[in-house]
Amino acid sequence: MRAMIDANGDAARTSGARIVHACGHDSIPSDLGVQFLQEAAIGRFGVPCRRVTTRITRMKGGFSGGTAATFLNAMKLRKEDPGFDTVSGDPYALCPAGDRDGPEGPDRMMPVSVTWDADLEAWTKPYFMASVNAKVVRRSNALMGYPWGRNFRYDETALTRGGVGGWWADMRYALFGRGLLIAMAIPVTQRLLIRHVLPKSGEGPPAQLRETGVYEVIQVGELPDGTILKAKVTGQGDPGVEPTTRMLTEAALCLAQDESRMKVGGGFWTPASAFAALLRDRITAHAGLSFELNEAGGVRVVPTGPRSGRADEDGVKQAAGAATVPPAP
């Protein structure tokens, strides 16, 4: 993404072309989910959450050949590009030039770390796509003019359970994930994995698993006064297959059919900065996703509505509860 933005960003802005990255399972639940939670916080309390954590609480799906090919390509790029590790480890690598700093520490794809989540009272383990999703969320905040503040913090992991059993299960997963990455980086073991373990390009999970797959994420936001707000994003189907296809389709239709209601001009965008409620409403209606706000006494769906207006890539300014948008270039 960083390479594409650097190479073609000026041309996209000049031509008016809108290119939106990360419109599948990575990173729509994270990106649009955080935006949904922050809009609820601003609407209810007048201020955004200073910190949001995303916890993957359910994930049932298979491992496809396309996913394997993506990891193998990342290993290849790491060898060929001396700056690859620097970019992948920089939590603000996808933010516009001049905005690539903040309070977060380095991103790591699969750290050997298990942490306790005091908000949800359970152990968490590394989630292998978290470093990408987190960069997209931070880029959204920057592109929209920092509606969540320049000191906004974001963290994403997978959630299991409490107790010693939960800690041990998470630690085994973390060690296995780290070991797999090391094995994929060594030529001999990489060849063995490709030949005997990893699915081939075009291969994927069986139909039954694709249809019965499910995923759920809980997002916890902390306001400046310590108030906690929680939201939930759920979806049906293997997240990397049919739901991703539906999300990509709805994103394309949003670009084609909702142009007059989009508030951005040409450039490279994220789902939240380009589409916001327009895409949330589409994928809720047609892609099997739901965005829910957890409240005392139950969970209720918060309706979202379309927005209007346009701006250039670096010009969207959003204050608490309202957006001020300069004219399109």
Where do the model's predicted regions map?
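Rossmann-fold NAD(P)-binding glycine/threonine-rich loop
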Residues: 1-17
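Short glycine/serine/threonine-rich phosphate/pyrophosphate-binding segments
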Residues: 2-4, 26-33
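C-terminal catalytic/substrate-binding lobe primarily of soluble NAD(P)-dependent oxidoreductases
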Residues: 13-18, 27-28, 35-329
